[in-house]
Amino acid sequence: MQQTKKLTHSDITIAVMSGPFLQRGEPALVSKWYRTKMALACGVDLVVELPYAFSTQKAETFANGAISILNALHVSEICFGSEDGQIENFYNTVSAQKNEEETFNRLVKQFMNAGNSYAKATSEAFLHILSSEKNIDMSQPNNILGFQYIKAILMQNSSMQAQTIKRFASHYHDETFNDQHIASATSIRKQLFSENSSFTEIESFIPKATASLLASYKQNYGTLHNWEQYFSFFKYKLMTMSPKDLQHIYEIEEGLEHRILSKIQTSSSFHSFMEALKTKRYTWTRLQRACTHILTNTTKEEIHCANIEQHAPYIRLLGMSQKGQTYLSKNKKKIELPILTHTKTFDHPTLHIERKANSVYFSIMKEPLRTQLLKRDATHHPIRYDETTAKFL
C-alpha cells in the first residue's frame, strides 16, 4: 500500500476485493466486512466488492471484472504486484501474444492434447512465442494476473495507466516465513491453521490493525475459515449427486465428474481429497475453484445468465474513508453502474449467485449467529472510517 501511494502519487486509493470465496478457489480467511476494516485501517479510501461470478474464476475473467469496476469508478491508474516488476514488459508480452495469436492458440491446443493443464499449456506456449528479455515469465502467478489486467485495460479501451511493484523475498505459494518480515498469504494461512497456531507468529508480517482484527474475528465468531471446515458439507453434497447432476456445475468438464465422485468416497479430509483428485491436466487451483462451485451449487446456466463476458453489472460499496466518501459525492453522476450500499432490494443474476455464496460461507457458524450474519450481510451498509482519528464511525 505504501509503495503504491509512493509510486502513483494518488489522490485516493480504491481496492476491489473478492467476497466470501477467492480466485484460488478457497474461502476467505475472514468475512469481507472484517477485510474491509483491515483495508480502510491500512490506508484504502474505497473498498468495493468483486462479485463471485468474477472473483472465483481464471485470471482472465477475474481481471476483466476488476478492471470494469475500476473503469466505472473513473480510476486513472492501477497498481499491482508482480514477480517481474517492469510494467513495459507486460505491455510487450500482451503485444507479442496479439501478434502471434494464431500460433499461440495452436500451441496451447497442442500442449493440452499432450495432457497438460491449461495453465501449463499456456506457459509453454508463451515460452515458444516470446524470445525477448523484455517479456514477462508467464509461469509466475502474479505475472499472469498482471498480464490479464493489461489485456483487460486495452480490450476495454480504458485510458487507465498501469504500474507494477516487484514482489521480493516471498513468492505467492511459499509456505514458510523468511527473515525479511515479508510473507506470502499461503504461509500466513498455513501458520494460522497449524497445530500450535498463534497470532504472535504472524504479527511481524502483517499490519498491526490486521492482526488485531484477525484476533477479534476469531474471538467473536470462534473460527477462521478454510476448506477443511466445509469438507463435511462438501462430502455430503457429493454423496447425494449423480454424474449428471455434477455436469451442470460450472467448470465441471471432460468427465471430471466421474473422477470427483470416485475420489470423494475414500477421502477423510479436503486435503486428502485434493491430493487424490489432482492430475497433470488439472492444477490444484483449477480443481479448488470447481469444488467451490460444487459447494455453492453454481451452475453453468447461472454463470451464463451473469454474462461474465461483459462488465460487472453493479458496484457493491463495502467501505469508505472520509476522503473516499468525498470522491464518490463528486463523481456519482459520472458513474454509470449502480452503486449498491446494500443488496436487500436489488435484483440481478450475478447477485443471486452472490447470495448463495454468502449463505454457504456462513454455514459453518452456529445458530443463531449463522442466520444473524446472513441477514446482516444483505442489509449491511458501507463501513465508514475517519482517517484523521483512525476510528470507525
Curated annotation (Swiss-Prot):
One of the record's GO cellular component terms: cytoplasm
Q: Which reaction does it catalyse?
A: cytidine(34) in elongator tRNA(Met) + acetate + ATP = N(4)-acetylcytidine(34) in elongator tRNA(Met) + AMP + diphosphate
Q: Name the keywords, alphabetized.
A: ATP-binding, Cytoplasm, Ligase, Nucleotide-binding, RNA-binding, tRNA processing, tRNA-binding
Keyword Transport assigned:
no
The question of whether Kinase is a record keyword is answered with no
- Going by the record, the broad EC class of this enzyme is ligase
Q: Name one GO biological process term.
A: tRNA modification
Q: Where in the cell is it found?
A: Cytoplasm
Q: Which GO terms describe its molecular function?
A: ATP binding; ligase activity, forming carbon-nitrogen bonds; tRNA binding
- Its primary localisation, in coarse terms, equals cytoplasm
Q: Which domain of life is it from?
A: Bacteria
State the protein's name.
tRNA(Met) cytidine acetate ligase
Q: Which organism is it from?
A: Bacillus cereus (strain ZK / E33L)
